[in-house]
A protein has these predicted regions:
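Conserved AdoMet/S-adenosylmethionine-binding subsite of the radical SAM
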Residues: 130-282
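A short alpha->loop->secondary-structure connector
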Residues: 117-127, 171
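Auxiliary Fe-S-binding modules of radical SAM enzymes
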Residues: 1-53, 242-306
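The canonical Cys-X-X-Cys-His
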Residues: 109-113
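Active-site beta-to-alpha loop of glycosyltransferases that engages the nucleotide-sugar donor
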Residues: 104-107
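Short, flexible, glycine/charge-rich loop motifs used to bind or transfer phosphoryl groups or to couple energy/partner
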Residues: 47, 88, 138, 187-191, ...
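Short, conserved glycine- and acidic-residue-centered signature motifs
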Residues: 93, 126, 217, 283, ...
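N-terminal [4Fe-4S]-dependent radical SAM core
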Residues: 3-102, 115-119, 140
Length: 306
């Protein structure tokens, strides 16, 4: 996209969902056109400048042609998946769910398994309307499909499309499943949250230093999980990265916090080298040890990628 300015996150507002004043200049604007009127994006703590010509860190939101959501209806991946793959172990076990993804993500995990679409500005694919996807989901009921899952990239960077699809799915009496990193401010999502039946949230770690590594904010994710736990079925996944978030004390604290929100299943997954992460795979013994620590607080702890 020649001539399109890419915004960076606002370091001054990284740890809060309070939207900065449009008049306030940030370090990010030193790399763009400082004369542009600020239009802070409200959906995540990065608060990128989406004034005309700007594109957010997620690559899916920007001020281009008067549109904030740049990936509306863009489908890069679609498949009928087992519900276990989300992963959701205690929500309609044995069923399948039509799973769709677009492009864009507001984190920068070195180990991302879907980095081709998560970090893309635009990808070739197909266009689909919310009604078209809902009708496709309904046509697959005979194959065990319970609804639509929003996954693969980070779906909430295009929350308007997720909301519109979810409304169509709800009218058909089917289920909406959200797979997300949870690094989002709640107020812009209040119209969507009541439409979600189940979610798996990637709780990347349980220290802010870890979230600094992946480009996010721990407290924002904790608030997101707590809010969703009050309205729908919630499961949580933590990818265990050697030397980063594999201390028993950290997983113990994470599980203790989750237990205060209710009966939330926790998935501890093994990490393998991919994308920009060149470390060793997580030793299976580490996962077994961490699962024991988590089970001191939680009834349902599962291991993945073993």
């Amino acid at each position: 996209m020649t001539g399109v300015l890419t915004a960076e996150m606002n370091p001054e507002t990284k740890k809060t969902c309070s939207v900065p004043s449009p008049e306030k200049k940030t370090e990010a604007e030193a790399h763009t056109d400082g004369s542009r009127e600020r239009k802070p994006c409200p959906i995540c703590p990065h608060h990128c400048n989406l004034s005309e010509g700007g594109i957010g860190l997620c690559h899916a939101r920007g001020g281009v042609g008067g549109k904030d959501c740049l990936n509306y209806g863009d489908i890069t991946s679609i498949a009928l998946d087992p519900i276990d793959k989300k992963p959701l172990k205690r929500f309609h076990p044995g069923s399948t769910v039509l799973s769709v993804g677009s492009f864009g993500c507001n984190l920068r995990c070195p180990f991302c398994q879907n980095h081709e679409i998560a970090t893309a500005s635009r990808r070739g694919g197909q266009k689909a309307s919310p009604k078209e996807l809902a009708d496709l989901a309904a046509s697959m009921k005979a194959r065990g499909n319970i609804g639509l899952a929003y996954t693969y990239n980070e779906p909430l960077v295009g929350h308007e499309f997720v909301r519109d699809c979810a409304a169509e799915i709800r009218m058909l009496g089917m289920k909406n499943v959200l797979v997300t990193n949870g690094s989002f401010c709640l107020e812009p999502l209040e119209g969507l949250i009541p439409l979600i039946d189940a979610t798996n949230v990637d709780l990347k770690g349980f220290t802010q230093s870890y979230y600094d590594w992946v480009g996010g904010d721990l407290e924002t994710v904790k608030r997101f999980i707590a809010r969703l736990a009050g309205t729908c079925h919630v499961e949580v996944t933590t990818l265990v990265v050697p030397g980063k978030n594999d201390r028993a004390e950290e997983i113990d604290a994470l599980a203790a916090w989750l237990s205060g929100l209710g009966d939330i299943p926790l998935h501890l997954s093994r990490c393998f080298p991919r994308h920009r992460f060149e470390g060793e795979p997580t030793p299976p013994d580490t996962l077994y040890k961490l699962a024991d620590a988590a089970r001191a607080h939680l009834k349902h702890v599962y291991l993945g990628n073993i």
